[in-house]
Amino acid sequence: MLSRGHCCKLKHSFNGLRNVALKRLVGSKAGYRMFPNLIEKRIRRIDDALADGEYENLSEILKYDPLNIIELVQESELRGRGRYGFPTGEKMLSLYKATSSERGRKEKPVVIVNAAENDIGSFKDRLLLRHEPHKIIEGAIIAARAVEASACYLFIRKDYYEETVMMQKCIIQAYAKKLLGKNLLGTSIGLELLIHPGAGSYITGEESALIQSLQGEFPVPDIPINNTITSGLFGLPTLVLNVETVSNLPAIIKKGPKFFISMGRPNNRGTKLFSISGEVNEPNVIEACMSIPLKDLIENYAGGVRGGWNKLVGIFPGGPCSGILNKNQCEQVTMDFDSLKALDSSLGTGSVIVLNDHDQIFESLLNFAKFYSTNTCHTCPVCRDGVEDVIETLKGLKDGHAHLSQLKDMFSKFNMPSSSKVFCGFGDSMRHQIHSIQRNFPDQITFRTKVT
């Protein structure tokens, strides 16, 4: 059984980050790691980063035409490492085209690096902030150059205090080396990089809510994602990228897109950081090539399922928003955007939550529902009414005495098409979870339901 909260296994993964060991890279070309210091865990002073080749050739990269940078990112097939996996190059190009208008020339774009990391089961971004700060800074500089931005905000989860302090020290070091500020490395280009602590709300991980939080407003999603490109922060054209996405940019630009696409498979390139927690022997963060088999990820790089693979009952492959896969699906699927989409699941943030008891399925869903009921903005019917209404039904399923009428009501509430009547993707998160148990665990639902 999972314990109170999200479960003690997850709490161990969240709170024991100092002792988390990031495993060796799986299946990469020549064993290359995008983020080697996640294993080495050296203190990243800027002189050490420079000695390791970070910021190398940056003065030349700053001279690139922005479209050249965007083309390299497009060729790499890099997709967002946050929740939605949107092609990064296309996002950059959309903003670049938008700012080529008369209005765009008068107003400089803004870049936002999203390190809010409020998803249940995700702790990869915290390790990036702690151990690869200069890769984040360098990636932010490259992203800003690609869209000709002069300001970048690093939005960090509020309770990542130590990581925020460390990042600020590294930013100060970068300013001292003329890597930030006016006239970067003797060029005419300038970039100001500012840290902004998150509002402490789960909803600020959503793009438009994040922008409202940065503006000092109450974070409520209300802007379609495509509109933030033309009118985002303070009405300026805005590029929002996840911190892991940004951290991939230096290697892509320096080593070339062919290097990046040598890992993974078409439309699912490069490596990915996976936060693995729950019923595994070694909860940790793993850097693996895209398309690694899920079973291989768990068995060979997370110490295996507690009690052995035969004890496995299900896995949330991308956090709660991805829904839960049954054992048979877990044995077949590979960890990438397209393979999981084919199962009506998603990669999400790469938060892999492993369960080895059927009771845990319904206990985890109940815990997630309680979390959403207090942490979403309650604007849309799904989050405002739907989530709270299903809590009693999920309690019944967990305890084995759900009523058939309750189940029919629950499934009807979440039977709307995806993204129907919702402002943001969070409204679909609970919907995916409900659909996944209905689709992948029908026998368990029948077993736990009273007919009368």
UniProtKB/Swiss-Prot annotation:
NAD(+) binds at G80, R81, G82, R83, Y84, G85, F86, P87, T88, G89. GO terms for cellular component: mitochondrion. It is found in: Mitochondrion. One of its GO terms (molecular function) is metal ion binding. It holds the Pfam family SLBB_2. SUPFAM superfamilies: Nqo1 FMN-binding domain-like, Nqo1 middle domain-like, Nqo1C-terminal domain-like. Its main location: mitochondrion. InterPro entries: ComplexI_51kDa_subunit (IPR050837), Nuo51_FMN-bd (IPR011538), Nuo51_FMN-bd_sf (IPR037225), Nuop51_4Fe4S-bd (IPR019575), Nuop51_4Fe4S-bd_sf (IPR037207), SLBB_dom (IPR054765). FMN binds at residues 198-245. It is an enzyme of class 1 (oxidoreductase). [4Fe-4S] cluster binds at C377, C380, C383, C424. Binds 1 FMN. Binds 1 [4Fe-4S] cluster. Its cofactor is FMN; [4Fe-4S] cluster. Residues 1-25 form a transit peptide. The keyword Transit peptide applies. Keywords: 4Fe-4S, Flavoprotein, FMN, Iron, Iron-sulfur, Metal-binding, Mitochondrion, Oxidoreductase, Transit peptide. The keyword Repeat does not apply. Belongs to the complex I 51 kDa subunit family. This is NADH-ubiquinone oxidoreductase 51 kDa subunit homolog SPBC18E5.10, mitochondrial. It comes from Schizosaccharomyces pombe (strain 972 / ATCC 24843).
